[in-house]
Amino acid sequence: MARIVGVELPNNKKVWVALTYIYGIGRSRSFEILKNTGIDPEKRVGDLTDEEISKITKYIQDHFKVEGELRSEVERNIRRLIEIGCYRGIRHKLGLPVRGQKTRSNARTRKGPRPSRIKTKKKSS
């Protein structure tokens, strides 16, 4: 298994698919990386040479924020929205949808599970 920017990539996958295992790299970026480093996207990770792995790693580190760096930036951005008290920040704080979706009947994922009702026994008279 090849290790690129701290992520173990499975040997049996094609390189373009394996690169999408890295947080911050999707299909488009994966193909862009391979095009600019001159590596065949259809090649398997197990067939990559050490030189090719270091090429990919260097290109990613020079051009993109990935993994922990990207996660912390996203977290900082959300924290900033909450601190300045804008509408989006308030929605994040309350755990509601941020991008204008309706919430009357949907948004169960964002709102979390419904509070369970406690059933009370009826007294027989």
UniProtKB/Swiss-Prot annotation:
Q: Which GO terms describe its cellular component?
A: cytosol; small ribosomal subunit
Q: Which InterPro entries match?
A: Rbsml_uS13_C, Ribosomal_uS13, Ribosomal_uS13-like_H2TH, Ribosomal_uS13_bac-type, Ribosomal_uS13_CS
- Keyword terms of this UniProt record: Ribonucleoprotein, Ribosomal protein, RNA-binding, rRNA-binding, tRNA-binding
Q: Does the keyword RNA-binding apply?
A: yes
Query: Which SUPFAM superfamilies has this protein been placed in?
Result: S13-like H2TH domain (SSF46946)
Gene Ontology biological process: translation
Q: Where is this region: Disordered?
A: 97-125
Keyword Ribonucleoprotein included in the entry's annotation: yes
Q: Name one GO molecular function term.
A: structural constituent of ribosome
Instruction: Give residue spans, biased composition: Basic residues.
Output: 101-125
**Pfam families found in the cross-reference section:** Ribosomal_S13
Q: Which Gene3D superfamilies match?
A: 1.10.8.50, 30s ribosomal protein s13, domain 2
- Alphabetical list of HAMAP family matching this protein: Ribosomal_uS13
Briefly, what is this protein's role? Located at the top of the head of the 30S subunit, it contacts several helices of the 16S rRNA. In the 70S ribosome it contacts the 23S rRNA (bridge B1a) and protein L5 of the 50S subunit (bridge B1b), connecting the 2 subunits; these bridges are implicated in subunit movement. Contacts the tRNAs in the A and P-sites.
UniProt lists the family membership as follows: Belongs to the universal ribosomal protein uS13 family.
Q: How does it assemble?
A: Part of the 30S ribosomal subunit. Forms a loose heterodimer with protein S19. Forms two bridges to the 50S subunit in the 70S ribosome.
Name this polypeptide is given? Small ribosomal subunit protein uS13
